[in-house]
Amino acid sequence: NTRPESVNAKILKQFIEIGLDRLSVGLEHGNFNFRKNVLKRNPSNETLLEHLEIIANSGVSFSINNIIGFPTETREMIFETIEFNRLIRGFDALTISIFTPYQGTELRELAIKENYYDSESLTTHTTSSSLLKMPHLTSEQIDGIFRTFLMYVRFEKELLPEIERAESFTSEGNRIWKQLFDLYQERYY
């Protein structure tokens, strides 16, 4: 596991020489201001893309790791992460996680301060559903984007309205999601 900005051609070449064949790269978020001010990661999107291009050109297989559902995050910010992923070339896998408010982290404290999370709750493992109660982005909305994130990144823009309908956990949303999931499996596995 690494951050994109920590990779340069010289270091990557040295790791390849000793047997590196795969990298897992933590992008986490595509909105520069959110990444800088909330996640405390300063590299610009342009810098990250430059470093990801070095990895893509090396021939090393790599995956991109993303997180959604952060405290104060909006739907628009999540879609900036999706759009940023659409710019990255050469990856062979994407992972998407939902933010987990781990004890002792600044982000957990932010969630508590904003009344998105109960200070008495303890989380000891990653979650498959958002634990935050944000008025501007519900757990169900986060879960819907979570289940369609890979489709938003990989599919052509003409399918975006259908993907948005697949976010919904209704019978229609589930039916559309299943059709799109089957198409995703056919194309990418």
Where are these regions (language model features)?
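A structural motif corresponding to the C-terminal lobe/cap of the Radical SAM core domain
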Residues: N1-S171
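C-terminal non-catalytic accessory extensions
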Residues: T170-Y189
